[in-house]
């Protein structure tokens, strides 16, 4: 199934696109968010966003301590399903035990 045909997934502290835009302090009008997870726990925050724009797939990763938030960290990097799959299966993507931002299993299911 094409990712664009799936219902967007918002996990943990995010429930919609507006929450993502507010936390990053950025305009997301031309962004099609596909999958987003953010957790703020023990004075630290960790975020991951997968989105489509102009037919290309991008991801944004952000993190912060208690002093700041995600503002100024909206720095999209182009990605592929293959790259995400590799990082999910061979690395530790989506398995953050410090901030509790656990989204690896959900992202694996979403992109397959």
Located regions from the model:
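Compositionally biased, low-complexity repeat tracts
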Residues: 15, 40-43, 58-59, 65-68, ...
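Amphipathic, interaction-prone secondary-structure segments
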Residues: 22-64
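Intrinsically disordered, low-complexity regulatory segments enriched in Ser/Thr/Pro
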Residues: 54-83
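Low-complexity intrinsically disordered segments
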Residues: 1-12, 22, 75-112
């Amino acid at each position: 199934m094409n990712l664009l045909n799936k219902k967007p997934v918002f996990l943990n502290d995010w429930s919609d696109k507006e929450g993502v835009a507010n936390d990053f302090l950025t305009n997301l009008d031309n962004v099609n968010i596909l999958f987003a997870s953010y957790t703020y726990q023990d004075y630290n925050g960790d975020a991951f966003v997968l989105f489509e724009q102009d037919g290309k797939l991008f991801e944004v990763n952000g993190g912060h301590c208690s002093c700041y938030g995600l503002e100024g960290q909206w720095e999209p990097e182009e990605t592929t399903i293959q790259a995400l799959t590799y990082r999910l299966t061979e690395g530790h993507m989506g398995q953050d035990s410090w901030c509790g931002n656990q989204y690896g299993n959900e992202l694996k299911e979403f992109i397959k």
